[in-house]
Swiss-Prot record:
It comes from the Bacteria. InterPro entries: Homeodomain-like_sf, HTH_AraC, Tscrpt_reg_AraC-type_HTH. This is Transcriptional activator RhrA. It comes from Rhizobium meliloti (strain 1021) (Ensifer meliloti). Disulfide bonds: none annotated. The lineage of its organism: Bacteria, Pseudomonadati, Pseudomonadota, Alphaproteobacteria, Hyphomicrobiales.
């Protein structure tokens, strides 16, 4: 089975010319041809991480802590680029529109036209490219949140960036596992659009199931959340909801359990020893720790504590 792993690029001793070549090659398939102009000094010592899957590309670049501009030509496809600066505000000029985002806030940007990206204080720059074909069923959904700053405090956005961070930090992933994580990444886009863009679920493709899954995602931490809660919110019967999930070869309860276990696994891998296993279990809606441990081991073939230990040793 093919193994997918992030690429660590650059070193603190890498000279300016080589740093520029590395940055160009990394950003080429995300922003198009890009020229980087620091206000002072050069790009000596740039480092970062790059991860690529067939339907998602991710990069984190650690630029010098000085004002710099990135002039990007854009891509040939009509996909979406997600941008974030962690050490600086972010200023973007795109098609005569200027957008400013605070430190750690996020901007969704069309990838098919040139842009000028300014980091007044330089530092860490995060970028994701979502190709057009992967967004086919979600393009209209994203329109209300394009080209506006999205606050870092938004919970669906935090989940989205946590998935991206996990993919960039995890040393080894099977193609199957990477595909599952990317699918979850895309599943969060309707949730984000609903939370920020105030998009009615009935305006989106596959509206009912997308709305149901959105409600599940928003209530994973609620241990008492049930199919009855969804039925009341959607104004349909629990039986109708079960029919929707039956068409996907599962049940409501199995879907919720799978999402909770998947989120728990991501948090275990991403947070290291910062949060206890029991707290993670409760945070994703499990009220019984022994049940969590049992179902987690049944699904992934390893106990949560052993997974954390293996990840730390990798």
């Amino acid at each position: 089975m093919e193994t997918i792993r992030p690429l660590k690029f650059g070193t603190l001793s890498l000279p300016d010319r080589e740093s520029r070549l590395v940055c160009r090659s990394i950003l080429l398939d995300m922003l198009g041809e890009a020229t980087i102009a620091p206000d002072e000094g050069d790009l000596t010592g740039v480092t970062g991480l790059f991860w690529k899957y067939v339907s998602l590309s991710l990069a984190t670049v650690y630029f010098p802590r000085t004002m710099l501009r990135v002039n990007a030509s854009g891509m040939g496809d009509s996909g979406v680029v997600i941008l974030r600066a962690m050490d600086s505000p972010l200023v973007i000029r795109h098609r005569r529109i200027k957008v400013e985002a605070a430190r750690a806030d996020v901007i969704f940007l069309p990838s098919d036209a040139s842009s000028e990206i300014t980091l007044p204080e330089g530092g860490r720059f995060d970028c994701a490219h979502l190709p057009a074909y992967a967004l086919a069923s979600k393009r209209d959904l994203l329109k209300p949140i394009m080209m506006q700053p999205l606050a870092a405090e938004c919970l669906p956005l935090q989940l989205l960036t946590n998935y991206a961070g996990y993919l960039l930090r995890q040393e080894y992933q099977s193609e199957e596992h990477a595909g599952m994580m990317v699918a979850h990444f895309y599943d969060l886009l309707p949730v984000l659009a609903q939370d920020i863009g105030n998009v009615s679920p009935r305006e989106t493709p596959h509206n009912r199931m997308a709305s149901i899954k959105m409600r599940v995602e928003q209530n994973l931490a609620n241990g008492s959340f049930s199919i009855t809660d969804v039925a009341e919110a959607e104004r349909i019967t629990p039986r109708a909801i079960q029919k929707f999930f039956s068409r996907e070869g599962t049940t409501f309860s199995r879907y919720v359990l799978g999402r909770r276990l998947s989120l728990a696994k991501s948090l275990i891998l991403a947070e290291g020893e910062a949060t206890s296993i029991s707290q993670i279990a409760y945070n994703v809606g499990f009220n019984d720790l022994s049940y969590f441990n049992r179902t987690f081991r049944s699904r992934y073939g390893v106990r949560p504590s052993d997974l954390r230990r293996l990840a730390a040793a990798a």
